[in-house]
């Protein structure tokens, strides 16, 4: 049913200290909205500094799509307090606006109302905005306003020294990369458990479907929302942030070199569909190039191997240089039951699950099995709470009840929890006991709880009431780790950093694009 992890768990129980010092970081996106729930038409608030260069507060696709970024930390409480302070400071400087508390947007009548994120006049800033212009023209702007939470995770070097028998990160980078790729393969095989518990987009506003074809059997709430009775995360479905043009890319997770090779091939592979758009229209750039991927970040994935880049390095070149440094989990919807979009239970569960993914045997995965794994995910995304829902084991081999597979996994996770709790208290085991109950009571999952609220109040009504409640909560509570002085210092520093960037440009934007936009970066619409 699931891999036999008993030997690895026994090893872990004999080496409990190797898990003390897990490093984490959180990125949370949220839309700025008006009091009636429409997208804010204002620019990025000046009190938040420059989104291009601010360390903690930036923008994602749209000018109204805020993104909060915590520094790397090994203390869960400190990370969540830091994230809370970013929300507190922002709320204090949003006078007539609120932060939308859900993944799926509402009240967007027209895509032309969505302003792309603006990053100033430097070449790098203009490049980032043009990349977003390309996303808009390729996939539509509405899809890009969907919000999520990204969780960055890395195991301490002490774990790898004991697990892979290495001496340090540099000499052991291949073993560490292999370990993280093992994690990724198991994530594809069993990560559907994340939307089962934490998917929080079982319904969408009717406006989200305007002009879009779907064969999904939506039902309507009295307030006009469209929902699937057992859905968990429509954000992760074909209606959400996915990219069908990437479905035939040969990107695998067995070896770092082949992963990078597949990624580089995709950013050089011409797309007939995107070539029809052209790179310029009426003399204005509308995308970086006409390849399947404009840049590597365009690759849609529920999890990514990462390394901090140096200078102008691409993400894949950074991986080749130093190996995988950490993992970015991208399957979390916004948690609507907390002002900051993510909570401690989720973080502790992800720790447990990702550690299990490293420990469990993970045979190499071909394209066929990857497609089978995606089918499992899709079943959970669209019908995860359906009574008797089953999960495919392998490709067409057999199907097992989701609850049965989940409970078998939790028997292992409880052993991991006891090891982690030896570093600090009993909270990991408590998380296991709390979540395991949801297999028998799926109405307790985020999607189950949220759907009941949406049926009663509508997405707009419930979302706006939460947005106002959280706004008042944030503005009326004190900072926990940061200060107004710290925020003001970072605001001023971000302004200076952006000004320095703009002064340092020595070539035109056209020349910059020739250097950085990859092949197939000229041509007009056909």
Curated annotation (Swiss-Prot):
The keyword Nucleotide-binding applies. Its EC number is 6.3.2.2. Signal peptide: none annotated. GO terms for molecular function: ATP binding; glutamate-cysteine ligase activity; metal ion binding. It comes from the Bacteria. The keyword Cell cycle does not apply. It catalyses: L-cysteine + L-glutamate + ATP = gamma-L-glutamyl-L-cysteine + ADP + phosphate + H(+). Pathway: Sulfur metabolism; glutathione biosynthesis; glutathione from L-cysteine and L-glutamate: step 1/2. Belongs to the glutamate--cysteine ligase type 1 family. Type 1 subfamily. This is Glutamate--cysteine ligase. The lineage of its organism: Bacteria, Pseudomonadati, Pseudomonadota, Gammaproteobacteria, Enterobacterales. The gene is gshA.
């Amino acid at each position: 049913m699931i891999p036999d992890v008993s030997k690895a768990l026994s090893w872990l129980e004999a080496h409990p200290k190797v898990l003390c010092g897990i490093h984490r970081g959180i990125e949370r996106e949220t839309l700025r909205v008006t009091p009636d729930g429409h997208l804010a038409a204002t620019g990025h608030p000046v009190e938040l500094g420059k989104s291009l260069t601010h360390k903690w507060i930036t923008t994602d696709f749209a000018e109204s799509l805020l993104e909060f970024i915590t520094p790397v930390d090994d203390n869960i409480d400190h990370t969540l307090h830091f994230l809370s302070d970013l929300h507190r400071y922002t709320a204090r400087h949003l006078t007539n606006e609120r932060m939308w508390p859900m993944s799926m947007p509402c009240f967007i009548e027209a895509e032309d109302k969505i302003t792309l994120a603006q990053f100033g006049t430097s070449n790098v800033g203009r490049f980032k905005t043009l990349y977003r212009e390309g996303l808009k023209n390729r996939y539509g702007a509405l899809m890009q306003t969907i919000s999520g939470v990204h969780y960055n995770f890395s195991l301490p070097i002490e774990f790898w020294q004991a697990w892979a028998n290495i001496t340090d990160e540099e000499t052991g980078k291949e073993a560490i990369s292999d370990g993280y790729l093992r994690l990724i393969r198991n994530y594809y095989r069993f990560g559907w458990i994340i939307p089962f518990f934490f998917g929080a987009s079982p319904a969408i506003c009717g406006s989200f479907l305007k002009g879009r074809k779907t064969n999904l059997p939506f039902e309507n709430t009295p307030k006009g929302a469209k929902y699937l009775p057992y859905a968990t995360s429509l954000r992760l479905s074909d209606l959400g942030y996915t990219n069908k043009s990437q479905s035939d890319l040969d990107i695998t997770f067995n070896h770092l070199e082949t992963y990078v090779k597949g990624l580089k091939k995709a950013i050089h592979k011409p797309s007939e569909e995107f070539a029809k758009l052209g790179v310029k229209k009426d003399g204005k750039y509308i995308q970086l190039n006409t390849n399947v991927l404009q840049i590597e970040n365009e690759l849609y994935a529920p999890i990514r191997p990462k390394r901090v880049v140096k200078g102008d390095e691409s993400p894949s070149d950074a991986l080749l240089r130093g190996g995988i440094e950490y993992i970015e989990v991208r399957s979390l919807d916004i948690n609507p039951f907390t002002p900051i979009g993510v909570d401690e239970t989720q973080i502790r569960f992800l720790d447990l699950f990702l550690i299990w993914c490293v420990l469990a045997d993970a045979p190499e995965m071909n394209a066929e099995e990857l497609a089978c794994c995606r089918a499992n995910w899709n079943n959970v995304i669209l019908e995860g709470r359906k009574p008797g829902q089953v999960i495919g084991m392998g490709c067409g081999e057999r199907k097992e009840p989701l609850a049965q597979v989940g409970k078998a996994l939790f028997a292992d996770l409880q052993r991991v929890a006891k090891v982690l709790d030896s570093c600090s208290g009993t909270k990991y085991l408590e998380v296991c006991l709390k979540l395991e109950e949801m297999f028998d009571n799926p109405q307790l999952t985020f999607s189950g709880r949220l759907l009941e609220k949406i049926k009663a109040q509508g997405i707009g009504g419930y979302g706006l009431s939460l947005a106002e409640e959280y706004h008042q909560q944030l503005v009326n509570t004190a900072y926990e780790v940061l200060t107004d002085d710290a925020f003001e210092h970072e605001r001023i520093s971000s302004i200076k950093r952006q000004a320095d960037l703009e002064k340092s440009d020595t070539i035109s934007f056209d020349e910059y694009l020739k250097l950085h936009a990859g092949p197939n970066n000229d041509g007009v619409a056909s």
